[in-house]
Each structure stands twice: as structure tokens, then as C-alpha cells.
From Swiss-Prot:
Signal peptide: 1-19
Protein name in the entry: Penicillin-insensitive murein endopeptidase
Coiled coil: none
GO biological process: peptidoglycan metabolic process; proteolysis
One GO CC term on file: outer membrane-bounded periplasmic space
Record-annotated membrane-spanning stretches: none
Entry keyword set: Disulfide bond, Hydrolase, Metal-binding, Metalloprotease, Periplasm, Protease, Signal, Zinc
Gene source species: Salmonella paratyphi B (strain ATCC BAA-1250 / SPB7)
GO MF annotation list: metal ion binding; metalloendopeptidase activity; serine-type endopeptidase activity
Cofactor note: Binds 2 Zn(2+) ions per subunit. Zn(2+) ion 1 is bound in the active site. Zn(2+) ion 2 is bound at the dimer interface by residues from both subunits.
Alphabetical list of Pfam families matching this protein: Peptidase_M74
Sequence positions that bind Zn(2+) 2: D147, H150
EC number(s) stated in the UniProt entry for this protein: 3.4.24.-
The encoding gene: mepA
Cofactors named for this entry: Zn(2+)
């Protein structure tokens, strides 16, 4: 498991010094009926909605990065989740990266978030709204111990667990990625109501936020869904494997060349950028 500082930096690092991808040259959503195209890690979106940055229930971080675009289903999910959180007195929901105006590949920080169906949400629920300065330069609250084996008790709360559970119980949500230690704590705390845990998937980093992914909309015919998570709550051998030391002889996988774009996404780039 990577050290805390490196893990958090990977999510919050500024991309200003990296070469822009063609998708970053598209500054407004592409007109048309909303269509998520391709896969979460190789796709785009037509007709994206803009998440309103003003809301009583949530706040949007790093608005200067302009990553608050997504499929209308994603915008409605964020509004729905944050309203439920407010009704339960959990606090203000802090919204991180969604996607770019036309989706597509980032120049760093994300492999997915390309079809307008992904959103990062801080696992903090402030009772007092953040200032503009705090939102522009958010400070992540690392919930995981240095050795990566458990959450930090003084930072974990039932409210955080409730927020994750609310998101997982939403019918549009297909996966929620969190650090393995966070998944482990959810497993310990869940009690008999465990069906929602199937959607909560352990993944590298994700020590301070959850990454929520929605299913492909029914009318997005070129959208590629992932297979459903394995049956069960995911709290057994699969989860424990994340805490085992790496096998001898394993090497870091080589960086792969990005696959060709879906034809509709390439056509979108050809028309609007190239």
C-alpha cells in the first residue's frame, strides 16, 4: 500500500503542469440529447449537465478545475444524496471531481470519470459550510492508518458510514470504491442489513473520499457497463486479500497505451477539436 502522503497527492495534485489532452480543450458541453458513450475509462458524453455550484445541501470543491459536468442522472444523484444527508442531519456533502464538459480522458489523476457517470465525494461531513478558500484548496481527512490495515478511530464516524450506505442503496449506483480499510470497517459495523455492501468495492488509495459510479442510462445505447460485483457482501476472503503482503516476484504493471476511442467519441473530437 502506498504511503499516505503519496496516496492523497495522487488525487489532489494540480494538473496545470501536465500537457492537456484534447478533451480539455472542449470548454462547454456538446449539445444534444444526453448520451454516455464507451466505457468509464475510455469514453465521452454528449449533452452533459452542469452541476449547480450553489446548493444548501452540498458544496463543490475546486471549481477552478471545471470538473463539475456529468450525465443528468449523475447530477440528479448528487442532488438526491445530498438532500437525504441533510434530512438525516449528517452535514454538508463535499463534491469533488465529476467529469469534463464532454467527458474524455484527463491528463492526470483519473483513469475513469470519462462518461459522465463518476463522482468523487469527500468522506467528511462538515456541520459548518466551508469558505471559498477551503473549497478551492480542500484539505483531505485521511481516514486510514499509516499501515493501511484499519481506519483511524478518532476520524471515523457513523455519519460517514451512513453517507456511504445511502449512496450504495441508490438504485442508479453500481459501484462505490473505497480504501480496503474503510470497506473492512463498514463490514464490521453493518449488522444484519448487508445487501448494500456488495456495491462497496475495495480499491487502492481512496483514503479520504469515495468514488461513486452509476449504471449506464437505458437510453445511452453506446455506453458499456461493467459486470455486476460478485454476489455477497464482499467481506470475506476477497477483502482480506488486500491486507496480505505482495507475492514475491510481482512487479508493477507497465503503463498501457490508451486504447482507440469509440468511433462516436473520435468523431466528436474531430468535429470540436481537431
Amino acid at each position: 500500500m502506498k504511503k499516505t502522503a503519496i496516496a492523497l497527492l495522487a488525487w489532489f495534485v494540480s494538473s496545470a503542469s501536465l500537457a492537456a489532452t484534447p478533451w480539455q480543450k472542449i470548454t462547454h458541453p456538446v449539445p444534444g440529447a444526453a448520451q454516455s458513450i464507451g466505457s468509464f475509462a475510455n469514453g465521452c458524453i454528449i449533452g452533459a449537465d452542469t452541476l449547480p455550484v450553489q446548493s444548501d445541501n452540498y458544496q463543490v470543491m475546486r471549481t477552478d478545475q471545471r470538473r463539475y459536468f456529468g450525465h443528468p442522472d449523475l447530477v440528479m444523484f448528487i442532488q438526491r444524496l445530498s438532500h437525504q444527508a441533510q434530512q438525516r442531519g449528517l452535514g454538508t456533502v463535499l463534491i469533488g471531481d465529476m467529469g469534463m464538459p464532454a467527458g474524455g480522458r484527463f491528463n492526470g489523476g483519473h483513469a475513469s470519470h470519462q462518461t459522465g457517470l463518476d463522482v468523487d465525494i469527500f468522506l467528511q461531513l462538515p456541520k459548518t459550510r466551508w469558505s471559498q478558500a477551503q473549497l478551492l484548496r480542500p484539505q483531505a481527512l485521511d481516514l486510514v492508518s499509516r499501515d493501511g490495515k484499519h481506519v483511524v478511530p478518532s476520524r471515523w464516524s457513523s455519519d460517514i458510514a451512513s453517507l456511504i450506505k445511502l449512496a450504495a442503496q441508490d438504485n442508479d449506483v453500481t459501484r462505490i470504491f473505497v480504501n480496503p480499510a474503510i470497506k473492512q470497517q463498514l463490514c464490521l459495523d453493518a449488522g444484519n442489513d448487508r445487501d448494500w455492501l456488495r456495491k462497496v468495492r475495495p480499491w487502492f488509495q481512496h483514503r479520504a473520499h469515495m468514488h461513486v459510479r452509476l449504471r449506464c442510462p437505458a437510453d445511452s445505447l453506446e455506453c458499456e457497463d461493467q459486470p455486476l460485483p460478485p454476489p455477497g457482501d464482499g467481506c470475506g476472503a476477497e477483502l482480506q486479500s488486500w491486507f496480505e503482503p505482495p507475492k514475491l516476484g510481482t512487479t508493477k504493471p507497465e503503463k498501457k497505451t490508451p486504447p482507440p476511442l469509440p468511433p462516436s467519441c473520435q468523431a466528436l473530437l474531430d468535429e470540436h477539436v481537431l
